[in-house]
Regions:
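Non-catalytic, solvent-exposed segments at the cell envelope interface
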Residues: 1-241
Length: 241
């Protein structure tokens, strides 16, 4: 089975006193910043405290720290990682001819500071690379009546999971194995990853072939959180029950 897990970016990380003291010493500005205990800031924390002196399993303080946080908090071992920039995301979607998906609401949002202009109509449609980026990033904007609405990060997370499920279902198949060379080029240009070297890449290709030759199921794992305000900052705190 393929399990898709989307970690809410505002998850609260309760760092140890050792990590906090290191951060206070090496990066007092970050230590004093509100929101540094969100999981989406963990890679920055790892870099600032020079976690494991860049000698961890990935040889990169920020990635090693985030991977160890995920393992400690969620008991999920990170064997490899792939960091995809937005250009790479768009290019990969276009390489496979887009993704057919149902857009649940009118998505209209303009943000000149990010050079982000989202404009999607609701309904079933095939999204190209740029439109797919709009779809997975949208969480607030104008509805069909022209009213501004905040749909929350939870709404965006659900859309991201649906997008990944649709991408896997539509494109992870034998007929697309011929795109491996083009995909490898895109990976080299746009993706930072631990999956390097002929042997490791071959292992993943063989794993892909095995999954294509058998029926497999897709599961979306939901991380149950509760909204919380700590020192005036919004967090998602993981439910313990």
């Amino acid at each position: 089975s393929i399990r898709l897990i989307n970690f809410p970016r505002d998850i609260y990380i309760d760092y140890s006193e050792h990590v906090l003291s290191l951060l206070k010493k090496k990066s007092p500005k970050l230590y004093g910043a509100k929101g540094f205990q969100k999981i989406n800031a963990a890679h920055t924390v790892g870099s600032r405290i020079e976690y494991e002196d860049n000698m961890g399993r990935f040889g990169d303080s920020n990635i090693d720290f985030l991977a160890d946080i995920i393992e400690e908090v969620f008991m999920i071992r990170v064997d490899d990682y792939a960091y995809v920039n937005t250009k790479g995301f768009r290019s990969i979607v276009d390489l496979f001819g887009g993704v057919e998906i149902n857009v649940p609401v009118r998505m209209k949002y303009d943000d000149p500071t990010q050079d982000l202009y989202i404009d999607l109509q609701p309904g079933l449609q095939t999204l190209n690379g740029e439109q797919s980026e709009w779809f997975v990033r949208f969480r607030q904007g104008y509805d069909k009546n022209g009213e501004f609405k905040n749909y929350s990060d939870e709404f965006r997370k659900e859309n991201q999971n649906e997008f990944l499920k649709a991408f896997f279902k539509q494109h992870i198949n034998l007929k697309n194995l011929g795109k491996v060379d083009e995909l490898s080029k895109l990976i080299g240009e746009n993706i930072r990853t631990s999956i390097i070297g002929v042997q490791k890449i071959s292992e993943y290709i063989n794993l892909l072939r095995k999954s294509l030759n058998k029926n497999y199921t897709q599961q979306s794992e939901i991380i149950e959180c509760a909204d919380s305000i700590i020192d005036g900052v919004y967090f998602n705190k993981i439910r313990s029950e």
